[in-house]
């Protein structure tokens, strides 16, 4: 199945790439945006109430300077760059639970603070730099450049979201509920279920990717999207640990505007600091529909490949063996219901099986009214009912979250 997925993507890449020069209104160019595609492949960033003034001032100054610039190309050219778009936001969280033994975790936390800058060079190359801090942990999230001259064929290199998972590339503002699904966190590389020390990577890796949107319709939407990424497999801010590369990719169909269906594939491995290498062979199916501010999204993913902790060496014989099932899967369904111009309520069912069997299932039922009083100000009160078969003492409990989002 892995070979069929890779070959299907390879065949699609071989289709001659041509820009649609007869319908500029179909693929309208949007300056200073990383991805103006309807198919989401990376987080969509926006300026906030402070950075909007900064960006406007920079853009105004650059326009005056560019009026005197000669239009030519070369290593000494310094014009033909867009005004960089700065942005940032923070998410604060209060959490409480009635789960036995977990009350000490109740309280306020800093979920994250992010700063980013986007822009273009020569109009054909887009770049992004994004950094994040979680309490005392400061690290680089994204750094990449993408040649994007044609919507049918783009080339990206750097550190960015893996080509695996529909929810994975979403900005936290756009997920709906107050956290990513268990599927996304465990099976797309956010805090991967293999359990090694360097697998909390926010679904990102370092590598090179080609992607594009094919076959424009009369109403402007594109029927087909593809991505194919070759990456280290070790995650962010670290060098490769073995000679093999991970391959991730997707084929997505948009038969009518707003309806998306498709599949992702991932084959590769991860080498931990103790020298143990585990395989990651995964597939994912999804559907998504957005219309009139109503939203629906569902995903199913399956993984084969052991955890690092499954590797055992007998202390007497020295023989190595693997424990566990070497499988995991998860699925979720969520719907967003528009209520008022400032209120949209999200419902979500989220399930994950850590060893691919029902005895390891953890189900979360969530209700989350999202309160948008301003484009740059959002509140998320959320109630979760959790049924966790992995917990013997208290498998059923309730959680309450309150998250505050501010884009500055």
For the regions a protein language model found, what residue spans apply to each?
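Outer-membrane beta-barrel "beta-signal"
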Residues: 371, 376, 396-408
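Outer membrane beta-barrel
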Residues: 75-236, 241-248, 252-261, 334-339, ...
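Extracytoplasmic loops and strand-loop junctions of Gram-negative outer membrane beta-barrel proteins
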Residues: 98-100, 189-194, 233-234, 269-272, ...
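C-terminal closing repeat unit and adjoining cap/tail of repeat-based domains
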Residues: 366-382
């Amino acid at each position: 199945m892995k070979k069929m997925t890779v070959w299907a993507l390879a065949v699609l890449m071989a289709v001659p790439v041509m820009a649609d020069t007869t319908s500029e209104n179909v693929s309208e160019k949007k300056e200073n945006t990383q991805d103006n595609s309807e198919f989401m492949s990376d987080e969509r960033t926006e300026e906030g109430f402070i950075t909007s003034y900064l960006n406007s001032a920079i853009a105004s100054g650059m326009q005056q300077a560019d009026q005197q610039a000669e239009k030519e190309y070369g290593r000494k050219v310094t014009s033909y760059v867009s005004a960089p778009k700065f942005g940032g936001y923070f998410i604060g969280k209060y959490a409480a639970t009635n789960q036995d033994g977990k009350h000490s975790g109740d309280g306020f936390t800093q979920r994250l603070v992010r700063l980013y800058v986007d822009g273009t060079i020569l109009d054909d190359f887009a770049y992004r730099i994004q950094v994040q801090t979680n309490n005392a942990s400061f690290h680089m999230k994204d750094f990449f450049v993408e040649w994007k001259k044609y919507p049918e064929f783009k080339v990206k290199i750097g550190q960015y979201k893996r080509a695996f998972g529909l929810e994975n590339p979403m900005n936290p503002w756009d997920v709906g509920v107050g956290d990513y699904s268990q599927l996304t966190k465990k099976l797309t590389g956010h805090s991967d279920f293999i359990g090694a020390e360097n697998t909390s990577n926010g679904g990102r890796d370092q590598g090179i990717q080609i992607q594009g949107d094919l076959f424009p319709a009369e109403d402007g939407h594109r029927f087909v999207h593809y991505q194919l990424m070759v990456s280290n497999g070790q995650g962010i801010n670290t060098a490769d640990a073995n000679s093999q590369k991970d391959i991730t990719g997707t084929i997505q169909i948009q038969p009518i505007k707003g309806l998306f269906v498709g599949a992702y594939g991932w084959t590769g491995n991860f080498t931990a600091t103790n020298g143990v290498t585990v395989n990651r062979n995964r597939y994912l199916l999804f559907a998504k529909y957005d219309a009139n501010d109503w939203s629906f999204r569902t995903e199913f993913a399956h993984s084969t490949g052991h955890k690092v902790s499954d590797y055992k060496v007998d202390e007497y014989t020295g023989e190595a063996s693997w424990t566990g099932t070497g499988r995991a899967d998860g699925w979720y369904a969520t719907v967003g219901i528009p209520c008022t111009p400032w209120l949209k309520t999200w419902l979500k069912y989220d399930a994950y099986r850590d060893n691919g069997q029902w005895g390891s299932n953890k189900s979360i039922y969530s209700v989350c009214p999202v309160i948008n009083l301003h484009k740059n100000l959002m509140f998320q009160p959320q109630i979760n009912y959790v049924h966790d078969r992995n917990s013997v003492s208290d498998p059923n409990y309730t959680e309450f979250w309150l998250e505050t989002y501010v884009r500055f």
